[in-house]
Regions:
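A generic structural signal for short hydrophobic patches within well-formed alpha-helices
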Residues: 9, 44, 121-122
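Short, well-structured N-terminal submotif of metal-dependent ribonuclease cores
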Residues: 1-39, 54-60, 67, 131
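Amphipathic alpha-helical segments within well-ordered protein domains
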Residues: 48-52, 87
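Acidic, PIN/NYN-like endoribonuclease modules and their adjacent C-terminal/linker elements
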Residues: 1, 103-132
Length: 132
């Protein structure tokens, strides 16, 4: 298995560098590509953040891109169920994808809640507000 950095994953959607995009395309269409590439939680979070901040993508487009990654057989995704739930929450909520994802992972690891000062994140059942 091979881990992928965020900038490699972004080249699936940003074709501005044709050489890099082609290299990623070749990599993912190799005969043994299925299940061979790791997308860890940090990469997924950076991917969503970069699409939002640098590429000014709307929330729905970011959620669609994340869904596409999560359903691609080439990728091994730790905490897949948590990632899928986080995309759903992100699509309908106000917090960032990374907020939902880290709280979903925390819950899967036994946490009852995740404390935050972020009122947007605290709108659902994953977070609790820490009063200052």
């Amino acid at each position: 298995m091979i881990g992928l950095d965020t900038n490699v994953v972004l080249r699936l959607f940003d074709l501005s560098d044709s050489k890099q995009s082609a290299a990623v395309g070749r990599l993912l269409t190799m005969p043994d590509a299925e299940g061979n590439f790791l997308l860890n939680p940090i990469v997924l979070s950076e991917f969503a953040w970069t699409l939002q901040r640098a590429y000014k993508q709307p929330r729905t487009a970011i959620a669609d891109h994340l869904d596409r990654l999560l359903q691609s057989p080439e990728f091994v995704i730790p905490f897949l169920d948590e990632a899928l739930d986080s995309v759903r929450r992100y699509r309908d909520g106000r917090a960032n994808f990374a907020d939902y994802f880290l709280a979903a992972i925390n819950r899967s690891l036994g946490c009852n809640s995740t404390l935050t000062f972020d009122e947007d994140a605290a709108e659902g059942d994953l977070f609790s507000i820490l009063k200052a």
